Design a protein with these regions (language model features):
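Soluble catalytic domains of membrane acyltransferases
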Residues: 55-140
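A transmembrane-helix-recognition feature enriched in membrane-embedded lipid enzymes
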Residues: 1-61, 111-112
Length: 140
């Protein structure tokens, strides 16, 4: 039964993510700031997390949110599942995303992500990738 629920959730997640990607791309044409448009990925993350709870029984606890600094900061997540991608959208405040540059080449999803002007790095570039993150991070 769990396998069937997981399959249903995955199919809905792919559909919802595709539709959300199109909405994000279209929203980039509006005279809105990135921060104003951030409501879209935030809602996407909240909805997919709720859906995972409703269909698959996902339960989670966020601890330490009160310790997030008020000034800009770097949030590092050990990427262990698809869920942590969703959670980042609503657990931390709107942020500049850091990702491997290949992600922006993914049709619809990557194009949508690129409208938020992420810091896209070449992970094989070593130290120069770190310098790129520092430089672009300071600019934001």
């Amino acid at each position: 039964m769990q396998a069937l629920r997981s399959l249903i959730y995955t199919m809905l997640m792919v559909l919802i993510t595709g539709v959300t990607g199109v909405i994000v791309i279209l929203s980039a044409l509006l005279p809105l700031t990135i921060k104003q448009r951030y409501v879209i990925p935030r809602t996407w993350g909240l909805f997919l997390t709720w859906l995972a709870g409703a269909i698959c029984g996902l339960k989670y606890t966020v601890e330490g949110q009160e310790n997030l600094p008020q000034q800009p900061f770097i949030s590092l997540w050990k990427h262990s599942s698809t869920w942590d991608t969703f959670a980042q959208m609503f657990v931390v405040p709107p942020a500049a995303w850091l990702l491997k540059r290949e992600v922006i080449w993914i049709p619809i999803v990557g194009w949508a992500v690129s409208t938020y002007k992420p810091i896209a790095i070449n992970r094989s570039a070593g130290h120069s990738a770190v310098n790129q993150v520092i430089k672009q991070g300071r600019e934001r």
